[in-house]
Swiss-Prot record:
Residues annotated as domain 4Fe-4S ferredoxin-type: 55-84, 95-124
Protein name as catalogued: NAD(P)H-quinone oxidoreductase subunit I, chloroplastic
Protein function: NDH shuttles electrons from NAD(P)H:plastoquinone, via FMN and iron-sulfur (Fe-S) centers, to quinones in the photosynthetic chain and possibly in a chloroplast respiratory chain. The immediate electron acceptor for the enzyme in this species is believed to be plastoquinone. Couples the redox reaction to proton translocation, and thus conserves the redox energy in a proton gradient.
Gene: ndhI
Key words of the record: 4Fe-4S, Chloroplast, Iron, Iron-sulfur, Membrane, Metal-binding, NAD, NADP, Plastid, Plastoquinone, Quinone, Repeat, Thylakoid, Translocase
Organism listed in the record: Oblivia mikanioides
Cofactor(s) it depends on: [4Fe-4S] cluster
Catalytic function, reaction form: a plastoquinone + NADH + (n+1) H(+)(in) = a plastoquinol + NAD(+) + n H(+)(out); a plastoquinone + NADPH + (n+1) H(+)(in) = a plastoquinol + NADP(+) + n H(+)(out)
Keyword NAD assigned: yes
A GO molecular function held by the record: NADH dehydrogenase (ubiquinone) activity
Keyword Acetylation set for record: no
Sites where the protein binds [4Fe-4S] cluster 1: 64, 67, 70, 114
Similarity comment: Belongs to the complex I 23 kDa subunit family.
Cofactor, free-text remark: Binds 2 [4Fe-4S] clusters per subunit.
């Protein structure tokens, strides 16, 4: 009799459903309006890294005994250790030690298994360069201690702690 009546009812139901979905999305948007921003202004603000952060590797040349444990435990055989055997004292003398941070996966195995603790992880993570060959650090570059983020007065540090809801 009136074939258009069910179509109008179906259209009305779809309109109500669409309005409900829009309202749900709007409520989610309003719930996010009161939250603090998550982003930081990176070069001027930096997050304080955790105590166990695995950044650039620091190397102490005087402590190394050239045992090559770091090379054996590295999943990609990355550290290059050059040494010379001193026959009169029957010991290895370290000549050169280098790590290519363009290849390093920062797993920390070399630091963990080093018997003399001559390797350690720092909180330095800004290693970007325009030339990948500059990422190959020798023992002099690895021995340089980085400036602590907390001690740098030119930037504002932000503590990265989860918020406690009260």
């Amino acid at each position: 009799m009136f074939p258009m009546v069910p179509e109008f009812m179906n259209y009305g139901q779809q309109t109500v459903r669409a309005a409900r979905y829009i309202g749900q999305g709007f409520m989610i948007t309003l719930s996010h309006a009161n939250r603090l921003p998550v982003t930081i202004q990176y070069p001027y603000e930096k997050l304080i890294t955790s105590e166990r952060f695995r950044g650039r590797i620091h190397f102490e040349f005087d402590k190394c005994i050239a045992c090559e444990v770091c090379v054996r435990v590295c999943p990609i055989d990355l550290p290059v250790v050059d040494w010379k055997l001193e026959t009169d004292i029957r010991k290895k003398r370290l000549l050169n030690y280098s790590i290519d941070f363009g290849i390093c996966i920062f797993c920390g195995n070399c630091v963990e298994y080093c018997p003399t603790n001559c390797l350690s992880m720092t909180e330095e993570y800004e290693l970007s360069t325009y030339d990948r060959h500059e990422l190959n650090y020798n023992q002099i570059a690895l021995g340089r201690l980085p400036m602590s983020i907390i001690d740098d007065y030119t930037i504002r540090t932000i503590l990265n702690l989860p918020e406690i809801k009260t």
